[in-house]
């Protein structure tokens, strides 16, 4: 079984990858997307989104990281795929699933699910540019407005030479609304000879088991669930006990220390509030604490609330 951390734009940055890989036995982490338009991007763009490239493409805990690209022009995607590999990325992934309106309006992400030939051309160009020993992968949804082109898109990725395919079991229009339609993944997994990775609505170990039973996949990708329950991958792979609220609060304080000592400290209030929006699903205590700290705007005020909460737990 493989468990892969999904790319989540604006959520799973290098610090979050560091934190989560330090407490989970992830097999692979995928970055937020690098936006490719019409040129070969400078190294600094890749290093900003994936500073792990400076350490051989690994997090401090030794988990490999794969750069994800988002774009619509095959040759530019190919050039930038090769650059990612040269910089140390463990393979390169193509994003055909992002549902964000701003991205779709500029012909990126899930909007390309309406054009299987374009998907094929992009993956084909990337595969031809990247040496065979390096994986070229793709992530798709079930479709854009409907699921009518789902199998055609999956075949386009495979026939273009992709190493494996991750599928988020919802369409663009579905967004993130439950349920996830895992049964569609089953059809592709039975038809394609390459590994298929199942993604969508995996919030706990039982969800992971059901997803693998329905799809027949032995690889899963987790995103929002991994932020909601920080040690989700560990519970899935080893049967570890899910983190208690005390465990999670301590992890948040560890995250806080790293955030404030790094380059992103100005963004801390927004980042920590965003994390609380995911934790609310798993921990009632998170909702209570968020109601207290949401009125604060400064880092100092928020850190004080978190430290007070931990102090009360330890009494």
Swiss-Prot record:
Name the UniProt key words of this record, in alphabetical order. Answer: Flavoprotein, FMN, NADP, Oxidoreductase, RNA-binding, tRNA processing, tRNA-binding
Provide the reaction this enzyme catalyses: 5,6-dihydrouridine(16) in tRNA + NADP(+) = uridine(16) in tRNA + NADPH + H(+); 5,6-dihydrouridine(16) in tRNA + NAD(+) = uridine(16) in tRNA + NADH + H(+)
Record-annotated active site: 98
Q: Which InterPro entries match?
A: Aldolase_TIM (IPR013785), DUS-like_FMN-bd (IPR035587), DUS_fam (IPR001269), DusC (IPR032886), DusC_C (IPR042270)
Q: What GO molecular functions are on record for this protein?
A: flavin adenine dinucleotide binding; FMN binding; tRNA binding; tRNA-dihydrouridine16 synthase activity
Q: Which cofactor does it need?
A: FMN
Q: Where does FMN bind?
A: 7-9, 68, 139, 199-201, 223-224
Q: Where is this site: Interacts with tRNA?
A: 35, 95, 176, 271, 273, 278, 294
Q: What is this protein called?
A: tRNA-dihydrouridine(16) synthase
**Which organism is the protein's source?**
Shewanella oneidensis (strain ATCC 700550 / JCM 31522 / CIP 106686 / LMG 19005 / NCIMB 14063 / MR-1)
The taxonomic lineage of its organism, from the top, reads: Bacteria, Pseudomonadati, Pseudomonadota, Gammaproteobacteria, Alteromonadales
């Amino acid at each position: 079984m493989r468990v892969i951390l999904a790319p989540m734009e604006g959520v799973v940055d290098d610090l979050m990858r560091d934190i989560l890989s330090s407490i989970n036995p992830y097999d692979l982490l995928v970055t937020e997307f690098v936006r490719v338009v019409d040129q070969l991007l400078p190294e600094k763009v890749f290093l900003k989104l994936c500073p792990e490239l400076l350490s051989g493409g690994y997090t401090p805990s030794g988990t490999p990281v794969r750069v994800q690209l988002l774009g619509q022009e095959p040759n530019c995607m190919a050039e930038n795929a090769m650059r990612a590999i040269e910089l140390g990325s463990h393979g390169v992934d193509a994003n055909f699933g992002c549902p964000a309106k701003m991205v779709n309006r500029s012909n990126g992400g899930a909007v390309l699910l309406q054009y299987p030939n374009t998907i094929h051309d992009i993956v084909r160009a990337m595969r031809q540019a990247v040496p065979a020993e390096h994986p070229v992968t793709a992530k798709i949804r079930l479709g854009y407005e409907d699921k009518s082109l789902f199998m055609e898109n999956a075949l386009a990725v495979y026939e273009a030479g992709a190493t494996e395919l991750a599928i988020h079991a919802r369409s663009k229009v579905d967004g993130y609304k439950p349920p996830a339609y895992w049964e569609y993944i089953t059809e592709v997994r039975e038809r394609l000879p390459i590994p298929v990775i199942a993604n969508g609505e995996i919030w706990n170990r039982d969800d992971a088991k059901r997803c693998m039973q329905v799809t027949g996949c032995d690889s899963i990708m987790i995103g929002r669930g991994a932020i909601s329950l920080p040690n989700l991958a560990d519970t899935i792979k080893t049967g570890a006990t899910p983190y208690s609220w005390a465990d999670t609060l301590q992890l948040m304080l560890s995250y806080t220390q790293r955030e404030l000592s790094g380059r992103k400290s100005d963004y801390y209030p927004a980042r920590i509030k965003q994390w609380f929006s995911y934790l609310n699903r798993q921990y009632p205590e998170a909702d209570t604490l968020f109601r207290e700290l949401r009125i604060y705007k400064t880092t100092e005020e928020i850190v004080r609330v978190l430290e007070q909460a931990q102090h009360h737990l330890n009494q």
